[in-house]
């Protein structure tokens, strides 16, 4: 009986709200700023979009023409519209802070360096493989190289122990994103198609999304006081949806069908887009999260 009373007393003491411990727990919980639910929903929905795209390419799309053989083409556009609208809404509704990107971050740096490598591979492949459009090939090659240099500068900034601005002005940003301007123009000049072929149409959306994201990102890193944080977050989620979740299934389908060598420059460029998509998702999460509250909790307990 006495032993039971002692156990009950110990349990009661453990549950008492001691000031130091309770304040620490409150500080820790408050310091943990979980990912915005809308942003998390957008990321998950984009992944579902990618899985659906993989199934669509494997079963419901003609491999030769790119035309839909089962279901309406407008169902594909509707799914894309939902993913894009949710990404934009999540980014605009959140309270991101672009300044949080001005600090070392190894995942961001790795993705930027990988993207730079694939863009450099696009440059080499464009010059090595001969095609009929000599002028367009050369322009695309050197613009890809410029984009590679810009992404490499971003990667070095994020992977260095002490943060350094990748550029003090926006000249490098303009040169680094010019390839996406060119891709939009080339899509209409060289390979225009009807709305019934989803992939060529969505390429334009991908280029515009990457252009907006990298432009706003470059401004946020070079001129933090003039950054548009909400546009940065929204465009980051959009490139996650379009440049990663939509593009990767198409690259995987090309790889499985054995068409990589015939489209090697486009394949490398697509891999670069995927890296930009991952980078967009990382940046969107970083701008909306705060550091863990463990340090503040430790100080309050002490």
Walk through the language-model features, giving the residues of each.
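Short, positively charged and aromatic/hydrophobic N-terminal segments
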Residues: 2-12, 17, 21-28
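N-terminal topogenic module of multi-pass integral membrane proteins
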Residues: 28-137
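C-terminal transmembrane-bundle signature of multipass membrane proteins
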Residues: 39-57, 85-88, 203-302
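Alpha-helical transmembrane segments of multi-pass integral membrane proteins
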Residues: 42-52, 108-125, 140-153, 169-187, ...
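Juxtamembrane "helix-exit" motif on the non-cytosolic side of transmembrane helices
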Residues: 54-63, 123-132, 184-195, 247-258
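Alpha-helical transmembrane segments of polytopic membrane proteins
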Residues: 68-84, 108-112, 122-126, 134-150, ...
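Canonical alpha-helical transmembrane segments
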Residues: 83-99, 149-159, 211-220
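Membrane-interface helix-boundary motifs at transmembrane edges
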Residues: 96-106, 157-170, 221-230
């Amino acid at each position: 009986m006495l032993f039971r009373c002692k156990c009950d007393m110990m349990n009661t003491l453990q549950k008492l709200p001691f000031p130091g411990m309770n304040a620490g727990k409150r500080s820790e919980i408050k310091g943990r700023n979980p990912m915005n639910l809308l942003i998390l929903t957008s990321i998950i929905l984009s992944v579902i979009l990618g899985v659906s795209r993989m199934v669509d390419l494997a079963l419901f799309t003609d491999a030769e023409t790119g035309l839909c053989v089962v279901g309406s083409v407008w169902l594909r556009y509707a799914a894309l519209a939902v993913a894009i609208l949710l990404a934009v809404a999540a980014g605009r509704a959140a309270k991101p802070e672009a300044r949080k990107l001005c600090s070392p971050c190894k995942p961001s740096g790795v993705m930027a360096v990988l993207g730079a490598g694939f863009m450099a591979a696009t440059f080499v492949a464009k010059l090595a493989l001969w095609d009929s459009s000599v002028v367009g090939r050369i322009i695309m090659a050197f613009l890809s190289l410029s984009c590679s240099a810009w992404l490499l500068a971003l990667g070095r900034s994020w992977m260095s122990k002490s943060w350094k601005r990748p550029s003090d002005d926006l000249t490098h940003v303009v040169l680094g994103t010019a390839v996406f301007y060119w891709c939009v123009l080339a899509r209409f000049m060289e390979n225009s198609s009807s709305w019934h072929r989803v992939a060529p149409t969505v390429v334009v959306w991908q280029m515009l999304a990457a252009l907006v994201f990298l432009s706003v990102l470059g401004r946020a890193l070079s001129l933090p006081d003039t950054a548009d944080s909400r546009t940065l977050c929204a465009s980051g989620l959009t490139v996650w949806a379009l440049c990663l979740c939509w593009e990767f299934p198409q690259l995987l389908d090309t790889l499985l069908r054995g068409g990589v060598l015939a489209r090697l420059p486009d394949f490398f460029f697509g891999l670069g887009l995927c890296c930009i998509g991952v980078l967009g998702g990382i940046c969107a999460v970083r701008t909306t999260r705060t550091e863990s509250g463990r340090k503040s909790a430790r100080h309050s307990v002490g």
